[in-house]
Design a protein with these regions (language model features):
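Conserved aromatic-histidine-acidic binding/catalytic patches
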Residues: 14, 87-95, 130, 134-144, ...
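Short loop/turn segments that flank or connect secondary-structure elements
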Residues: 104, 108-109, 115, 129, ...
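Surface-exposed beta-loop interaction hotspot
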Residues: 114-166
Length: 259
């Protein structure tokens, strides 16, 4: 079902910070399951998630036996899927120990390694300021941002297929919780070959609202680049987002929402 882009206007973007932080933290469970059971990929894509529009969930990479662990963002619940069933655990009010025990039990029952003790190679986001019970009305808005981003990036990915090696799959990265594609513009080592990252973040420490970004590599000199349209800016401060394009007041979504 196509995303109703106009619904992105239902919540003020700056009101989503707490719901986003809770969803970000919850997305670490699929990442832990992947890190515990998959061979590490050089780009960490083994721990990435993808948006499944049918389940309305961010799903981790497939594990042995067709198992996938994911997060239904709109209802804030962990899902555990096999080829024959889908089990779910509502996360509201659940301590990490209880969630970890539930997930470990599911994994071990399928002959997989437990995930709760897996140490991630980055700091897990804090949710000390957020209460899941107070964010029930805003979780669907976070889910809608991911659904809209996945749809738009999927279309954009098709338009960049003329390049070689070309665009990556649309992936959500649990470290920063952004969803993006990477368009490789030439063959060669990742640390030297030209590429462009294009993605959407639901918000982070730099911008407390969802935003769009374009991240060319190698990093260009902003003095040599043309002016950007209203609502966009060059932002060399961000650690992984050398060029960030915020979308305040929904300006960037106006034409898309009118489709």
């Amino acid at each position: 079902m196509p995303v109703s882009w106009s619904m992105l206007r239902n919540h003020a973007p700056t009101a989503l910070a707490a719901a986003r932080a809770l969803a970000h933290r919850a997305a670490q469970w699929p990442a832990r399951a992947a890190c515990a059971n998959l061979v590490p990929a050089p780009d960490d894509s083994h721990a990435s998630l993808s948006w499944d529009p049918d389940m309305a969930a961010l799903l981790g990479q497939p594990l042995d036996g067709g198992v996938r662990v994911g997060l239904r963002v709109a209802v804030h619940e962990l899902v555990f899927t096999t080829e024959s069933r889908c089990d779910a655990l509502p996360l509201t009010g659940k301590p990490d120990a209880e969630v970890g025990s539930w997930l470990d039990g599911k994994l071990v029952a399928e002959g997989l390694k437990p995930a709760s003790g897996t140490k991630l190679p980055y700091e897990v986001p804090s949710t000390m300021f957020a209460r899941a019970g107070e964010e029930a009305l805003r979780f669907p808005a976070i889910a809608l941002w991911f659904a809209a981003a996945a749809e738009a990036l999927g279309e954009l990915r098709q338009s960049y297929r003329r390049y070689t090696p070309g665009p990556s799959p649309v992936r959500c990265w649990p470290h920063h919780f952004d969803i993006a594609i990477l368009v490789a513009l030439e063959e060669g080592r990742a640390e030297s070959a030209r590429s462009i990252g294009i993605g959407v973040s639901p918000g982070d420490n730099y911008y407390a609202q969802p935003y769009l970004y374009v991240s060319p590599y190698p990093k260009p000199d902003t003095a040599d680049l043309p002016p950007l349209p209203p609502g966009a800016r060059y932002d060399p401060r961000a650690r992984i987002l050398p060029r960030t394009l915020p979308a305040p007041s929904w300006a960037v979504l106006t034409r898309r929402a009118a489709r």
